[in-house]
Design a protein with these regions (language model features):
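Amphipathic alpha-helical coiled-coil/heptad-repeat segments
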Residues: 377, 403, 420, 424, ...
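Functional cation/ligand-contacting sites centered on basic and imidazole/sulfhydryl donors
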Residues: 47-50, 448-570
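Internal insertion modules embedded within essential enzymes
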Residues: 372-439
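A broadly tuned preference for mixed-charge, low-complexity surface segments
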Residues: 17-31, 133, 217-219, 433-449, ...
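Leucine-rich, amphipathic alpha-helical/linker segments
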Residues: 197-218, 410-451
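Generic alpha-helical secondary-structure signal
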Residues: 9, 141, 156, 348, ...
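Toprim catalytic domain recognition across nucleic-acid enzymes
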Residues: 1-350, 357-366, 370-384, 389-391, ...
Length: 570
């Protein structure tokens, strides 16, 4: 969106045909979403009598949430006990025990005894700087740090893009192209001099580690633009300022030095048992100092990762003795899996729920960076998922939907395979025709195999039973069921035009409305007795029998019959 970038783009225009495959893939994605959605939503809504929104990506995402909820509910927490000895300046832990008595026995044998260092192992380790943000990783970080939803982050980033302060939002790349190195270097140097959290950086920025044109498809990573150097950030809305500052901090982290530390593991013998003490000594803060200062600036404490870090150990050597030691039992319980947050769910969507994918492996995910936020919002909007603070919890309706859906609709891995094939269409490794034939075949098979609701699932949607309409009567024209609607009583037969309107000219002239009871009597007996009918001619009311006089035309007619023994009211 910067003027210089636009001029640069026009100076290096590429033939439109180079993007034909990208267009084909986008068309396939839209077509597949429509074809699966319109068929599966109508199919399962009709089968179970309640609106059930089904989507090619939405349903597998919901299935991830339902599976996690089942794991949490089915988890049985068990206690554990860890014997520990306290030496001068540090604590060492023994092997975890299932029984408290066993841990207490170990502690009794160690209390007041001598602990001797058997081995000391030291390793120098490094944590490489993080990669730049793509949309999904930025959404995850904003949810983790600020609590923003994925849609809020996208909206803030889109606003920054339109103000020329950030690059294109909807990207799945975490790298820049080689021709951006000069611009990126100038930007990093400006950020180092003007952002408080950047002033700690002293080494030459390593722009090379964030540039790799082969890993950039249609758009590069999200970074600030040069416009940030001419903008007073204090005038930005809070959400936009938060996102832009975070993007700037990530650019500084990604181009800074590695974080290096020495990890120490010491094994001690005491009372015939082994105990282990672990510690960590920072040798070079590197990029983590930028992160620390950034969080300090936003008045945020330590991250969960920092809370779990081992403290530094005193200098230890083999055969070193500590006497006397005190021993105690640390009690704990096993924890269930955590509920998904938007941060962790977006991560799961990237890999279709497969954890621990190695760097560089093809990620067969659910949806695209541009669509994931909207999918999460729709799951909440249709009542399948609810937000409880940062947690995403499937509702009973959402859980029941996943229960009735077949695997080929709700399986994250199968859906991810389709997404992978779309990537192949983009690269010219698969044809759009083959992809759409597969989607059409799956949709056809889905409808053919699910013609009736499964008996075991019929009670899952009680709102369908409570909301199910009862027939008012039988249609005199076609024999179909006549159902009550908002404005009248209508035959369910699609080709039959029979209708009794609640407010029609006949009853309006007599200042009456056609009630459900009256309509039922007309359909069953062809007649209904009514009192208090108004006469336009005399201005008086009277009683009469209303007769159904249907000749098969567009409108149903009525006529009156007067009982011989009843007089008219005055």
């Amino acid at each position: 969106m910067e003027d210089a970038a636009i001029r640069e783009g026009f100076a290096h225009l590429r033939p439109g045909r180079e993007y034909d495959r990208l267009y084909d893939a986008a068309l396939c994605r839209a077509g597949a979403d429509w074809l699966v959605g319109i068929n599966a939503t109508r199919l399962f809504s009709v089968l179970y009598g309640v609106t059930l929104n089904v989507g090619r990506v939405m349903s597998p995402t919901l299935a991830l949430l339902v599976k996690r909820e089942a794991e949490i509910r089915g988890f049985e927490s068990t206690p554990f006990y860890v014997p520990e000895i306290s030496c001068k300046g540090f604590t060492a832990s023994g092997e975890k025990q299932a029984e408290k008595e066993a841990a207490e026995t170990i502690c009794k044998s160690c209390e007041g005894q001598e602990a001797v260092v058997r081995t000391v192992e030291k390793q120098t380790k490094a944590v490489q700087p993080p990669r730049l943000y793509d949309l999904t990783t930025l959404q995850r970080e904003c949810n983790r740090i600020y609590g923003y939803t994925a849609q809020q982050t996208l909206d803030y980033l889109q606003a920054l893009y339109e103000k020329k302060l950030a690059t294109y939002p909807r990207t799945d790349s975490q790298y820049l192209t080689e021709d951006m190195q000069g611009t990126a270097l100038s930007l990093v140097r400006w950020l180092r001099g003007n952002m408080e959290f950047g002033k700690c950086c002293t080494a030459e920025p390593d722009i090379g580690r964030v540039t790799d044109g082969s890993r950039v498809t249609d758009h590069h990573a999200v970074i600030p633009t040069a416009e940030i150097t001419r903008t007073d950030l204090s005038i930005l809305p809070a959400g936009e300022k938060d996102v832009l500052t975070l993007v700037a901090a990530r650019l500084l982290c990604a181009t800074d030095q590695e974080h290096r530390f020495e990890a120490v593991t010491a094994v001690l013998d005491c009372g015939g048992c082994s105990f282990t003490a672990k510690g960590k000594t920072v040798l070079q803060m590197g990029w983590k100092e930028v992160e620390r200062l950034y969080r300090l600036g936003m008045k945020q404490g330590k991250t969960e990762e920092q809370d779990r870090e081992d403290p530094a150990l005193p200098e230890l050597r083999e055969s070193q003795a500590f006497r006397p030691v005190s021993a105690s039992v640390r009690e704990g319980r096993t924890s269930p899996p955590r509920h998904y947050t938007e941060d962790s769910l977006l991560a799961a969507m990237e890999t279709a729920g497969v954890e621990g994918l190695p760097e560089g492996a093809e990620r067969k995910g659910l949806g695209t960076p541009a669509t994931r936020a909207a999918i999460l919002e729709k799951l909440v909007a249709v009542g399948f998922v609810e937000r409880k603070k940062k947690q995403l919890i499937p509702t009973e309706k959402g859980t029941n939907l996943v229960t009735v859906l077949p695997d080929n609709i709700k399986s994250p891995m199968l859906t991810a395979e389709w997404e992978s094939m779309l990537k192949q269409v983009e690269r010219g490794e698969a044809t759009a025709e083959a992809f759409m034939e597969g989607i059409a075949g799956m949709s056809r098979e889905l409808v053919e195999q699910h013609t009736t609701p499964e008996e075991r699932f019929k009670g899952l949607f009680p709102e369908a039973e409570s909301g199910r309409r009862e027939a008012v009567g039988v249609c005199p024209r076609c024999g179909g069921a006549v159902m009550e609607g908002k404005k009248g009583f209508f035959c369910e037969g699609r080709e039959c035009g029979f209708a009794l309107w609640k407010e029609n000219r006949f009853f309006a002239a007599k200042k009456k409305k056609l009630t459900k009871a009256a309509a039922s009597a007309l359909l069953k007996e062809g007649r209904v007795s009514m009192s208090g009918l108004y006469s336009e001619k005399t201005g008086r009311t009277y009683d009469a029998v209303v007769m159904l006089d249907d000749t098969g035309g567009k409108y149903v007619n009525f006529k009156l019959e007067f009982p011989a023994k009843k007089g008219r009211k005055k």
